[in-house]
């Protein structure tokens, strides 16, 4: 059920153009180690990738074998809306502040479904699948074209559907202007682009308008801890970096002076405190962390336990009540 608080949040998001949550986490924030299953293979099928949580905690996911987008608002136990689309095994989706849904179709294009529509409109044509999508505050859509080692972008104020290059020169490599099978992307309010550079085992930062990246995590960074095929990257409100470290089956947090595992820190399996190829990462407004646990065929949630050094999450009881 949508509340006045939800309405106020959505109005704020429309004003600043941000549709996702960026909680302010401390360097000591912790999450309960045992995850809750949000969607199993019975709901979303096998090996999920495309997933999104918006600013009022509505969950968007894809049932891949039925070409459906499933929408579950906060407070609902079941799916409230089903959108039948024309796509096959989409890798990514993103929802704008206006409620428009952008989805990788698997047919070398990105389609948009407006808030109340039942059919999609093609807004971007690409040469391969978009392994990640992002919509910035300047009405620009970004696509991580992993198989072509590039990130491309398109202003939706233009009349074309052909994007331009945002990062990567199209050659597989580890130089500062190259990427190797990039996956997750994130664009901050300064239009700086973060890229999970999977096969280079690093996260690259491309300042707005620049094509030479700076390594901020992984190989070549100041952090000595190894990462293995990062697949998703998120920046929180405190500018801490969260990374789905896919082949290490964990989620890590990077601050200005620390690097630590925060979820899936005990190997890979189907046990609730372990992950198996996490691919997509998102937060709700309470700071809970949602992860597509790909090879366990599920989407899971890790509940925030503490958000300051030594302090228990006093909002836990309230958030549980709000989500009922």
Where are these regions (language model features)?
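Blade/loop signatures of beta-propeller domains
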Residues: 11-34, 159
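Beta-rich, blade/repeat-based domains predominating
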Residues: 44-56, 86-101, 126-141, 172-192, ...
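Short loop/turn segments immediately following the C-termini of beta-strands
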Residues: 56, 64, 106, 146, ...
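Residue position within the beta-strands of beta-propeller blades
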Residues: 60-62, 102-104, 142-144, 194-196, ...
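Short loop/turn segments that connect beta-strands within beta-propeller blades
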Residues: 72-77, 113-118, 155-159, 207-211, ...
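Blade-level signature of beta-propeller repeat domains, shared across WD40, Kelch, NHL, RCC1
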Residues: 276-324
